[in-house]
């Protein structure tokens, strides 16, 4: 199911001409040609058409124009009925300018909703109706129960529940204020400014309150009422009654954006308030009548689509209507027959022969040796060969999969043979109804991904490539007299008890497990110590075979160390049903673990549905909405490792997205941004469909965002393709002319920011918009903030739109920096990182937040003249900061620069962020330093003449040292520099304590297909920089050495910067 074929207004045409001839077919058989404006609405076109039709024969056969709608063929080759007649001709995405007039039939509302959903996800919903796979149809029906449940939850307490869905509280996970933030308060109190609109002309009045930081919003409102009524000279009893009467009628809103304090959290737990305390700013809140918020909330009505009433297309055995037998009663080894291949595209002169390589895998681990077919000539790839595997059918685990690839062999006699995969595919050995696959099957294979080093791709997607013009392999599984099912839990438990008692030499009894457990509790102290040591190792450290045996023999004691579960699962022999059955019994009653630990069980190493189900239950129990938002990128990625469409993780994420609109917003965009990827377009498309069906009126907001993004993609495509040779002036003229057109003005104004749905983008400030100079022609866009109190937050919103750069790596790096910042803040380290907003919204398309009042180091150096620009004057940066921060605020600016520089030194070192130069390090006017453009990480650095260009572990040039030491001659001998080093050491050790979390977050991203994150070897770079094989003392010494290299090797960075500056000047 590919995404949309083009971003143009007609097939193969970016922009329609201003006037266009449209062929209109009327119900009386007449064809009328109309000249229409490209921006004309359908209602205008219809009116003109019926006026014109009176001049043609048979016009008396036509009914009134309101009885008809238009229908046409779109660029997806789909027939679409246009019910919304306010749509413009240029926005219909027609294949050709043909319109047919028809009388509408069928359920109008459902058709309109289906069109809106199709537009949002980028493919027509009817494509799902045509899929014959029963798993797809059952998923679509069954997932509606989650949708219904979520909608019912939103309506539970009427308006308040609905408000909580639309405006979920934006709070920190914990109410605890870190000590260094608490110390910024005045004896635990905070000054808050409360604003009230006092007239229809929006006249404002403000009240300044000093309140305890842990007050709940209702107490703040009560205090505001007391202050407001002070002039009324009420008695204490009257005041009490007044407060009681009005306190519950108001709510607090953040001035300048759509954020509300709707729940009884301590004030300082709200993120807005906490950031104000940290930055030393006074929070501005607006007092608003609860009723006015409730009255503008949309009423959600969720209607079951017509397909929910269709009967399942699953075969009778799937519905339990035919005789079945347990997998465990079969007494034969697994075998598979490879029949033949078609569409194998190879160069016969280069390739001698081809063969099929196969393996049975559980996650990335083989369950037995791989087996190859005979080699055959490429011209006629037929095998008809049974392959026998060294594994009994009863020993197949639930998540077993067959992995295969067609491979070529190259090499003459005596020379070393070269084996190369041509195409790969994977098949689940059990379908979604627990049934063992049987009979013949044709599998369309996938192209080999960049960076695949092995012949098989066991962690790749299962199932057939929807593109039928790819290599196709025909194969056959054994047939059995009855349908073969994986045993249920009661049979598994019985077998586990039997195998434990056999192992322990007890008689077969249900008391077997508990007796075994009692013996396990009498472990020697050094065994317990060894278990604890294994438990604390990072997820990438190898577990030896001896350690696996040791873990397994003490598996019952392991229950007392719940977080050891991932290591224990890796020690299970998944090709032994005895061990798997016992592990299932342990997992069933395993104590819950922290969400950060549970997430490890969702990566590609843990495919078993029981294990993944346990992980999801831990997330349901302990993962706050704030933490879920923080880890959402990874949780969406690991959906790719789920065996089937319907699973507990999908249900958990969908329910969260449908009960918290902020989570839903990013859930939508993370899924939508991968719809071009054929390996996941069906899975993600189905999930998007179910989200869009139940997200209520937010679908209209999402479609406004999608429409705006489509317009910007079209514009930038023209700039890169048709206007690439024009001057900047000509390109800018074209941009402004296009943006002034009515359809562009409609689409690009008055919608919610995809970067942050609490921010509204009002009117475009065209005079402030520009095309940036880099190769992909990004757009710098500027919108007004339409909020009534915008001057108290920001009056305009600047965003960079990029078309042509993959922003997923930037998005991941910024997320990791944000998590590092949280860890540091919670440990009392205020390193003032600036992880600005960044969102990938499609294939190499995305948005980046512009940080206000910031400049690149190069811009600052260029202000210092040629000498500064060419880096020979290291004092330029310090002088610039001094000029910007005169008097008392100078010390604060240097302190801010020092803290942020320390944070970014540590972060860029740990993450191996490359390509650092003076155009991607920025400084704000107040001294805060931050990095941008994270195109290279995990030590994949840019190369020049075959060598890695950067030769120091992180950037710490003389320019920075001079600022940190306040301009001292010998920078590294100052107290300020010592303090800076101390900050770096503390920051490094703090992240090292959380190494497992960062390794897990990167491991969960392995399925993303990012070029620099392909395997566990890439992630091993973090093990190296955090020195996880060393003691804490040794790790600190290692980091100190790296830091020493950085400031002594500063001249090499300087040379890189000089070359970069010269190159940029040449480009400009």
From Swiss-Prot:
Keyword Transferase: yes
PI3K-ABD domain boundaries: 16-105
Reaction it catalyzes: L-seryl-[protein] + ATP = O-phospho-L-seryl-[protein] + ADP + H(+); a 1,2-diacyl-sn-glycero-3-phospho-(1D-myo-inositol) + ATP = a 1,2-diacyl-sn-glycero-3-phospho-(1D-myo-inositol-3-phosphate) + ADP + H(+); a 1,2-diacyl-sn-glycero-3-phospho-(1D-myo-inositol-4,5-bisphosphate) + ATP = a 1,2-diacyl-sn-glycero-3-phospho-(1D-myo-inositol-3,4,5-trisphosphate) + ADP + H(+); 1,2-dioctanoyl-sn-glycero-3-phospho-(1D-myo-inositol-4,5-bisphosphate) + ATP = 1,2-dioctanoyl-sn-glycero-3-phospho-(1D-myo-inositol-3,4,5-trisphosphate) + ADP + H(+)
First-tier enzyme category under EC: transferase
EC number of the protein: 2.7.1.137, 2.7.1.153, 2.7.11.1
Domain PIK helical span(s) in chain numbering: 517-694
Function description: Phosphoinositide-3-kinase (PI3K) phosphorylates phosphatidylinositol (PI) and its phosphorylated derivatives at position 3 of the inositol ring to produce 3-phosphoinositides. Uses ATP and PtdIns(4,5)P2 (phosphatidylinositol 4,5-bisphosphate) to generate phosphatidylinositol 3,4,5-trisphosphate (PIP3). PIP3 plays a key role by recruiting PH domain-containing proteins to the membrane, including AKT1 and PDPK1, activating signaling cascades involved in cell growth, survival, proliferation, motility and morphology. Participates in cellular signaling in response to various growth factors.
Record PANTHER family: PHOSPHATIDYLINOSITOL 4,5-BISPHOSPHATE 3-KINASE CATALYTIC SUBUNIT ALPHA ISOFORM, PHOSPHATIDYLINOSITOL KINASE
UniProt domain comment: The PI3K-ABD domain and the PI3K-RBD domain interact with the PI3K/PI4K kinase domain. The C2 PI3K-type domain may facilitate the recruitment to the plasma membrane. The inhibitory interactions with PIK3R1 are mediated by the PI3K-ABD domain and the C2 PI3K-type domain with the iSH2 (inter-SH2) region of PIK3R1, and the C2 PI3K-type domain, the PI3K helical domain, and the PI3K/PI4K kinase domain with the nSH2 (N-terminal SH2) region of PIK3R1.
Name the record gives this protein: Phosphatidylinositol 4,5-bisphosphate 3-kinase catalytic subunit alpha isoform
